[in-house]
Amino acid sequence: GFGSLFKFL
């Protein structure tokens, strides 16, 4: 989900 993307950033 988007949460994972933010974590990656």
Swiss-Prot record:
Keyword line: Secreted, Toxin
Chief location category: secreted
UniProt-annotated location(s): Secreted
Summary of the tissues where the protein is detected: Expressed by the venom gland.
Keyword Transmembrane helix: no
Top-level taxon of the source organism: Eukaryota
Keyword presence, Secreted: yes
One annotated Gene Ontology cellular component of this protein: extracellular region
GO molecular function annotation: toxin activity
Record-stated family: Belongs to the cationic peptide 04 (cupiennin) family. 03 subfamily.
Protein name: Short cationic peptide-1g
Organism: Cupiennius salei (American wandering spider)
